[in-house]
């Protein structure tokens, strides 16, 4: 039996690869659209909301990037979030432990948000993206998480 690379593989190699990068929920939310490794558009959410260091979901920045690239959310090959929540949480715990007991109040204040929201960003991001694209979650491309310093 022959491998099934043939025509479909060739067609994919000739098409463009569109990747949407997202930073959100910490500070300075933003989005960037890459096509075949080249930056097509990038924007910070604060440029649209006029809220300094806006940490919200970057819906307006995403819309801008998609419009500039003349693509829709479902046309993307990948959506990539700038960090891995579990890795970030581990760094946070290590930092608190290394300074303990000094950061106890800060630690106690940040834990509820981490345990309720930030550890489950994949669900939140997919829901926000589906709402933004007016589509079902299943219609969205693969959502990936990059190492912070690689994104």
Regions found by a protein language model. Name each.
Residues 2-151:
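Short acidic/glycine-rich loops and adjacent helix/strand connectors
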């Amino acid at each position: 039996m022959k491998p099934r690379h043939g025509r479909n593989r060739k067609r994919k190699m000739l098409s463009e690869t569109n990747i949407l990068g997202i930073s959100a929920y910490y500070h300075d939310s933003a989005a960037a659209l890459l096509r075949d490794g080249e930056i097509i558009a990038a924007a910070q959410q604060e440029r649209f909301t006029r809220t300094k260091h806006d940490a919200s979901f970057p819906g307006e920045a995403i819309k801008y990037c998609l419009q500039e690239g003349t693509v829709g959310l479902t046309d993307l090959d990948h959506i990539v979030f700038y960090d891995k929540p579990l890795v970030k949480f581990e760094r946070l715990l290590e930092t608190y432990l290394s300074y303990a007991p000094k950061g106890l109040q800060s630690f106690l204040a940040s834990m509820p948000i981490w345990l309720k929201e930030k550890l489950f960003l994949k669900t939140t991001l997919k829901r926000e993206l589906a709402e933004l694209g007016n589509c079902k979650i299943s219609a969205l491309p693969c959502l990936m998480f990059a190492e912070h310093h690689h994104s």
